[in-house]
Amino acid sequence: MSTNSVTTAVEKADHQVSDVTLRNRLLDALTVSSGAVDTVSFIALGKVFSAFMTGNIAFLGMAIASTTGSTTYGVVPPRVISVLAAMAGFAGGIYLATKIVRRFEQSAANKNQQPTGVVWPRQTTLALSISLLAHLCFVLIWFATSARPGGSVIPVLLATWALAMGMQSAAVRQLDVPGIFTTAATATFIFLFGDWAYNRPLTSEEHSRLRGVLVSLAIGATAGGLLLIHAPIYAPVLPFVITIGVVVTAARAFRYDDEAQESRGNVPLAA
């Protein structure tokens, strides 16, 4: 093997490692965003999540049970309409983003432009870009109500933000990174502790990735809570700005043209 070939192989490997590291940091950022979203949703929008659908299903059951005329241990559950609005918005976001991704993939395949080994595909950035419209709508409505939305507006806000979170979840799913969804930590716990039970040692990259998600979710939740306390009008701006940053960074950092694919070796990369 020539010296040039060795140098090229090393450069390709460096590109791949660098791309994976950047991808993980972008996933951390999206997790911070969803942590802030759920904190603001739960506190300010009637104890309903915009991203964590497992919690909403439990809340829906509580709300239905409360229709019998009593509360569970004195806890007042959220309104059924609010929970259903969030669930419908999230489902709609997943459906919309998945349709966008599939159409993009089919179009690329028809043109024989579907790259392989891409750490962050273009369709993920596209879906996240469109989710910004839902974020923007939420921010505008929030500003219009001076951070104090009424009962009739809350379901609209929940559906809007859940739409954005559903699109984010579907976009991240395209990356096929084990244990990472950015909108909940349940899968991360399953992946982490399940592998420990099987005595399969995690790599340093896996440790960093999983730890980053858990820490980022806590950071986002804390930041969202602090904003609600000290500057409630700007609380939804944080996830909006973070998502913009992720979209811009991904669009600039990951190239998808043939020349870029050739420079990266066009080699499939394990998550």
Predicted regions and their residues:
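Alpha-helical transmembrane segments of multi-pass membrane proteins
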Residues: 2-271
